[in-house]
Regions:
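Active-site neighborhood of HAD-like aspartate-dependent phosphohydrolases
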Residues: 48-104
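Hydrophobic alpha-helical core bundles mediating ligand binding, dimerization, or RNAP-core interactions
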Residues: 79-90, 105-113, 130, 150-161, ...
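Short, acidic loop-to-helix structural element flanking the phosphoryl-transfer center
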Residues: 123-124, 158-189
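Asp-based, Mg2+/Mn2+-dependent phosphohydrolase catalytic module
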Residues: 10, 14-62, 179, 193-196, ...
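Short helix-capping segments at alpha-helix termini
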Residues: 91-97, 139, 209-214, 242
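Serine residues within intrinsically disordered or low-complexity segments
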Residues: 3-6, 33
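A metal-dependent, Asp-based hydrolase signature
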Residues: 100, 107-158
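Compositionally biased, low-complexity segments
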Residues: 1-2, 29
Length: 309
């Protein structure tokens, strides 16, 4: 049979036709062989047979994490650099002490990433961040002049901050993996943790050579109401894309953030360290690109296992 990834949209149909052809030949062989006193055992159903029989739901999209998945980066160094620069700007604008401003901003960012708000709070992460900065630091980030200052920093200053310490560059295998997904006719999106403004995320995309990748959706502070691993984050983005959880494969390196919590039906291909039990497939980004057929097969096998359990 041809490449699974190249015919993913018709995968089940192709497999059905192939199996029907082979089963017909085996039945004919069995009937003929009986005249010569020997028999051919009819094959047991394979995992892929079960996929078809169970009416498997077809994979439609692959969504990627960015940092340490598609982008090799010293993320802690980047966060520290960004945090110090933003704190310095807030200190100058608000005419407050640097230490106090850094402490307040740090608390806000911890609360944002930990999703410390009520379940009925539907503000975007950007709205939450802006309102908390105003409440705790006394600075209105939504003021046009102040907003423009931070936007300018993200787009015109931050791109030059990549140095030997941050060392951001494309992850080996990242572009080949994206090409494999595209060749398979699958939809593709960037599900990076939306704890940064759009400009800061696009900056890192530029460092990894991802700016021109035709992602259908890129998540950021302004279009998400929760951060990873909250299942709400994943489900609201899939709703925007018109997809259901069982139609999507997440690819990420973080054993906590890249697995929705609570589980919501999204499978994860894991490209980080360790061996999380929930992973559908494990390997490097280079492995993912080279063995994408195996990744797709693992997706369907996992789907069948869930159905049969």
């Amino acid at each position: 049979m041809g490449s699974i990834s190249s015919v993913n949209c018709d995968f089940l149909l192709v497999w059905r036709l192939f199996r029907n052809l082979m089963n017909t030949r085996l039945r004919n062989l069995t009937i003929t062989s009986q005249a010569f006193g020997f028999a051919v055992k009819y094959p047991e159903p394979t995992t892929l047979d079960q996929i078809y029989e169970k009416g498997a739901r077809v994979l439609k999209a692959v969504v990627f994490d960015m940092d340490e998945t598609l982008l090799s980066i010293n993320l802690n160094a980047f966060i520290l650099r960004y945090f110090k620069d933003v704190s310095s700007m807030l200190t100058d604008i608000g005419r407050r002490s640097r230490g106090g401003t850094m402490a307040r901003l740090g608390t806000i960012l911890v609360d944002l990433n930990a999703n410390r708000r009520s379940g009925t709070d539907n503000r975007t992460n950007l709205e939450f961040y802006q309102e908390e900065v105003e409440r705790r630091c006394g600075i209105c980030l939504s003021d046009p002049l102040i907003y423009e200052a931070f936007t300018y920093y993200d787009r015109e200053v931050l791109p030059y901050k990549n140095d030997d310490v941050i060392n951001a560059k494309a992850m080996p295998g990242a572009h080949a993996a994206l090409q494999a997904v595209q060749n398979a006719g699958l939809r593709c999106a960037l599900f990076t943790n939306p704890s940064f403004p759009q400009g800061a995320i696009e900056c890192r995309m530029g460092w990894g050579g991802l700016a021109d990748v035709p992602f259908e959706l890129v998540t950021h502070m302004g279009n998400a109401t929760r951060c990873k691993p909250d299942a709400t984050y994943y489900l609201e983005q899939l709703q925007v894309m018109g997809l259901k959880p069982h139609e999507v494969l997440m690819v990420g390196n973080d054993p906590k953030r890249d697995f929705p919590s609570p589980a919501c039906g999204i499978q994860t291909a894991y490209v980080g360290q360790g061996k999380p039990g929930r992973a559908t497939w494990r390997g490097t980004m280079e492995d993912f690109a080279r063995d994408f057929n195996a990744v797709i097969e693992a997706f369907y096998e996992h789907q069948v296992a869930d159905e049969l359990s």
